[in-house]
Swiss-Prot record:
UniProt binding sites for ATP: 43-45, 102-103
EC number per UniProt: 2.7.6.1
Protein's name in the database: Ribose-phosphate pyrophosphokinase
Catalytic class of the enzyme: transferase
Function, in words: Involved in the biosynthesis of the central metabolite phospho-alpha-D-ribosyl-1-pyrophosphate (PRPP) via the transfer of pyrophosphoryl group from ATP to 1-hydroxyl of ribose-5-phosphate (Rib-5-P).
Organism encoding this protein: Listeria ivanovii
Pfam families listed in its UniProt record: Pribosyl_synth, Pribosyltran_N
A single Gene Ontology CC term: ribose phosphate diphosphokinase complex
Residues where Mg(2+) 2 binds: 176
Reaction catalysed by this enzyme: D-ribose 5-phosphate + ATP = 5-phospho-alpha-D-ribose 1-diphosphate + AMP + H(+)
Active site: 199
Length: 318
């Protein structure tokens, strides 16, 4: 991508969820971030001011709905409304991490489908396009009636491990049945077999038993997941793999939510290295030596340029 992009009608704005990533994306595209400010009234209400003309412009707003989830979501909705009222030609939301994605269906009676509600809010506010990364449930794309580009970080994560030459005895592991498609994509890139962690609870109030489907004895295992939240699943999976004879266990994910006891669990686990992306900004207290962070800015920057130029983005999905 060129160092400078000469279309004054292309604007990129950042809100507060991940300004560092937004700056990287703007640098990848070759433009400066747009000027805006986010302030608060004395009672906590959010006030947004766009400090330059965006009339007739194609605007891209970088905002993950990560912690604080509700604050970041309200910032985004208010920003969309401000852009709409300032006569932006298109309002494109770049949401590296889509919060509330784990509430994508009614698992029990009288539950909301909050992922659909969030989609409705974004559309109603005035967004004209979504660009996002590794949604927890890909079918959330169907909750939107506007175009949505659903990118994934499998290529980025696969390249990281491929460049480390971990040997011929690699196995890519899905920590549950829902992640098999993701694991298979990485396995195809690394030319490795896959294994699956099959979690079962024999009866109520009895601890889950982790069965491993596939051969991991004497193998180097790479666990891939979309989200690591409290890290319970992934650290228990790593322990089960080592007990089954794996020589080393690595882990990676697109979205490092890392809530509650996550850092302690990862530190004490047999995981050699945890590789994450910067879809979520990580404070210093969510950082340990065995972690490494990869940037999704080149991927998102390329997507922005292709969308703006009406070029195909299909190769970015692979």
């Amino acid at each position: 991508m060129s160092n400078e992009y000469f279309d004054p009608k292309l604007k990129i704005f950042s809100l507060n969820s991940n300004r560092e990533l937004a700056e990287e994306i703007a640098k990848e595209v070759g433009i400066e971030l747009g000027k805006s400010s986010v302030t608060h009234f004395s009672d906590g209400e959010i006030q947004i001011n766009i400090e330059e003309s965006i009339r007739g412009c194609h605007v891209y707003v970088i905002q993950s709905t990560s912690n604080p989830v509700n604050q970041n979501l309200m910032e985004l909705l208010i920003m969309i409304d401000a852009l709409k009222r300032a006569s932006a030609a298109t309002i494109n939301i770049v949401m590296p991490y889509y919060g509330y994605a784990r509430q994508d269906r009614k698992a029990r009676s009288r539950e909301p489908i909050t992922a659909k509600l969030v989609a409705n809010l974004i559309e109603t506010a005035g967004a004209t396009r979504m660009i996002t990364l590794d949604m927890h449930a890909p079918q959330i794309q169907g909750f939107f009636d506007i175009p949505i580009d659903h990118l994934n970080a499998v290529r980025l994560l696969s390249n990281y491990f491929g460049e480390r030459h971990l040997g011929d005895d690699l196995v890519v592991v899905s920590p549950d049945h829902g992640g098999v498609t993701r694991a298979r994509k990485m396995a195809d890139r690394l030319k490795a077999p896959i294994a699956i962690i099959d979690k079962r609870r024999p009866r109520p109030n009895v601890a889950e038993v982790m069965n491993i489907v596939g051969n991991v004895e004497g193998k180097v295992c790479i666990i891939i997941d979309d989200i690591i939240d409290t890290a319970g699943t992934i650290t228990l999976a790593a322990k089960a793999l080592r007990e089954a004879g794996a020589t080393k266990v690595y882990a990676c994910c697109s979205h490092p939510v890392l809530s509650g006891p996550a850092m302690k669990r990862i530190e004490e686990s047999p995981i050699e290295k945890l590789v994450v992306t910067n879809s979520i900004a990580l404070p210093e207290d969510k950082w340990i030596d065995k972690m490494e962070q990869l940037s999704v800015a080149p991927l998102l920057g390329e997507a922005i340029v292709r969308v703006h130029e009406n070029a195909s983005v299909s190769s970015l999905f692979e």
